[in-house]
From Swiss-Prot:
Record-annotated BPTI/Kunitz inhibitor domain positions: 31-81
Tissue specificity field: Expressed by the venom gland.
Keyword tags: Disulfide bond, Metalloenzyme inhibitor, Metalloprotease inhibitor, Protease inhibitor, Secreted, Signal
UniProt function note: Shows weak binding and inhibition of MMP-2 and shows an activity in inhibiting migration and invasion of neuroblastoma.
Bilayer-spanning residue ranges: none
Annotated positions for site Reactive bond for chymotrypsin: 41-42
Protein name per its UniProtKB record: Kunitz-type serine protease inhibitor PILP-2
Signal peptide start-end: 1-24
GO terms assigned for molecular function: serine-type endopeptidase inhibitor activity
Organism: Bungarus multicinctus
Stored InterPro entries: Kunitz_BPTI (IPR002223), Kunitz_BPTI_sf (IPR036880), Prtase_inh_Kunz-CS (IPR020901), TFPI/VKTCI-like (IPR050098)
Record-stated family: Belongs to the venom Kunitz-type family.
Additional note from the record: Negative results: does not inhibit chymotrypsin and trypsin. Does not inhibit vasopressin V2 receptor (V2R/AVPR2).
CDD domains assigned to the protein according to its UniProt record, in alphabetical order: Kunitz_textilinin-like
Amino acid sequence: MSSGGLLLLLGLLTLWMELTPVSSKNRPPFCNLLPEPGRCNAIVRAFYYNSRPRKCLEFPYGGCGGNANNFKTIEECQRTCAG
């Protein structure tokens, strides 16, 4: 197969992976929790998984408490809940 064909195949595979939804059976249950800012008053940038658009979104975290649907980075959220 030519390098152009391999590049096209790689592109199509990447597109397929992006468009294929993650099965909710493989997603931890806490990914379905609503974002919980916690009981403290700090304003920390955090991310949570939103099951409606099936993606990780930013929310203001208070710095303590909250629930498990709370991630420091969007990459961590995506690895855990979005696939």
